[in-house]
Design a protein with these regions (language model features):
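A short, well-ordered alpha-helix in the C-terminal region of glycosyltransferases
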Residues: 183, 407, 418, 425, ...
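Glycosyltransferase donor-sugar binding loop
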Residues: 315-329
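Aromatic "clamp/platform" in nucleotide-sugar-dependent glycosyltransferases that forms part
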Residues: 366
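Short hydrophobic beta-strand element within catalytic cores of glycosyltransferases
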Residues: 383-386, 390-397
Length: 470
């Protein structure tokens, strides 16, 4: 089987939970060929992989969104059928366009993204939306907003499509559109595996964003919901990591019959071989993160400063690469300002090896799905302090039918005092830590084994391709 994995802003360029999952998935199916179709922001990243690609990756197709501005204008006076005009109108209004018609329209000879955005048809559509919904908004603001919003998607529609038996996208945004394009052009099935709810995550970002004019925030939110609906509609199977995520997909319009829960899987043999930490007089706390705003490392540093007032022998290890260099520099400066001498920023390391130095782990993310780093900690017998986002509380307390017990503490996000209190409590009692760590180990071994995930995806790939061919 030839499987095209469609990726957006992750593997193989950066590390992290989704990238680790993707790498593990590919390595788990040596009998299949994999094609990577990767969307990135900047063409300067072309070929700069942080992973050594497995031997069964036979092709890599890279698409960089900043290349969208390098295209030639094309025909400004392109003629459109009534059907095409309706699809383009629905697209510009961010409702429910006919994606097949859009794909055919943008791939016709002489059509380019810039050409459409400079056409009379686009001007007419933009004038309509201004009159209907934005009568008091500057026309120039609307033009630049729609241009920046629509250009990347129009650019993606014009890409050459690699051949595959199935197009498997790991997000419901730009990569979802690209997977739909692949399925449409080559008459092949589409699968979606969401690690977080893409449209909800973008909505949260837009609400907080300062770069989006207030008048256009609702339009931007509609835009990302439109992208999600596209792949929800075309995909044969839509997976999520836990029950509440599945409910969210259904609320957003996905057919419940398509929705499957496929939890992450961890190599319990590899991480189970991590020995208990040797007593050395320190209580070592590990934060396995990418240093980026979504991980909220700053709240962790503030909380650790509080911990040091009461637990002098506490030591914090921030384990992972700089995903956002500017934010990382701010974190280093904050650690200096707080006079935190017992904080180590390790950079990228072998997580399994490094966990032998750690008593317990902490994750302070403001948005998560089902963090793989937590499952790795559990498999290594390390309890966790987590923020109450995504599936984190369920991981700590157990889901339906799981009565193993509690594997750590859960606190609300961005609450430094609650986080500090939980860290202090975990530092205080070695016996409680070990008991919670053992519960975590049993939970990982029972419910989150990599072999279970591989079996699930073996069945899903076979089901999707067989059903499509039938």
């Amino acid at each position: 089987m030839r499987i095209c994995i469609v990726l957006e802003g992750c593997y193989p360029y950066v590390t992290g939970g989704v990238s680790s999952w993707t790498h593990s998935l590919i390595r788990s199916f040596p009998q299949h060929e994999f094609v990577l179709w990767c969307i990135g922001a900047d063409s300067a990243d072309r070929g700069k992989y942080v992973y050594e690609l497995p031997d069964n990756v036979v092709e890599v197709h890279e698409v960089f969104l900043n290349d969208a501005l390098k295209g030639v204008p094309g025909h400004k006076r392109a003629r459109f059928t009534p059907e095409q005009k309706q699809a383009l109108s629905d697209f510009v209004h961010c409702t429910s366009p006919d994606w097949g018609v859009l794909f055919e329209t943008m791939r016709q000879k002489g059509m380019t993204p810039i050409g459409f955005l400079m056409s009379e048809t686009f001007l007419d559509l933009m004038t309509d939306i201004c009159r209907q919904d934005y009568p008091y908004t500057a026309f120039s603001d609307m033009f630049h907003t729609l241009r920046s919003m629509l250009l990347p998607v129009l650019f993606l529609m014009c890409q050459q499509v690699p051949k595959a038996d199935v197009y498997h996208t790991i997000a419901a945004g730009y990569s979802g559109v690209l997977a739909c394009l692949g399925g449409y052009v080559n008459n092949a099935p589409v699968m979606l595996s969401e690690h977080g709810i893409y449209s909800r995550e973008r909505e949260e970002e837009i609400i907080r964003a300062t770069w989006v004019l207030p008048a256009f925030k609702r339009l931007w939110v509609r835009f990302f919901f439109m992208l999600s609906r596209a792949v929800y509609g075309q995909a044969s199977v839509v997976t999520s990591l836990f029950g509440n995520a599945r409910k969210a997909q259904i609320e957003l319009g996905c057919d419940p019959s398509k929705c499957r829960i496929t939890p992450n899987g961890v190599n319990v043999e590899k991480f189970g071989a991590v020995p208990p930490k040797e007593p050395d007089g320190w209580v070592d706390i590990g934060a396995i993160v990418r240093i980026a705003p979504i991980e909220d490392v700053k709240t962790l540093l503030y909380a650790f400063a509080e911990v040091k007032h009461y637990v002098d022998n506490a030591r914090l290890h921030v384990i992972g690469p700089e995903d956002d260099k500017e934010y990382a520099q701010e974190c280093y400066e904050l650690a200096r300002q707080l006079d935190l001498h017992d904080v180590l920023f390790t950079g990228r390391v072998d997580t399994a090896q490094y966990l032998s130095k750690i008593d317990f782990t902490v994750l302070t993310s403001i948005s998560e799905g089902q963090p793989l780093s937590v499952l790795e900690s559990f498999a290594a017998g390390r309890p966790c302090v987590l923020t109450d986002v995504g599936c984190c509380r369920e991981l700590l307390d157990g889901g339906e039918g799981d009565d193993l017990g509690c594997a750590g503490f859960c606190v609300e996000p961005m609450n430094r005092m609650a986080l500090a209190s939980a860290l202090e409590r975990m530092c205080a009692d070695d016996g409680e830590r070990r008991a919670m760590g053992e519960i975590g180990r049993k939970r990982a071994c029972t419910y989150y084994r990599q072999e279970q995930m591989v079996t699930t995806y073996t069945d899903l790939y076979q089901e999707v391709v067989s059903s499509w061919q039938a």
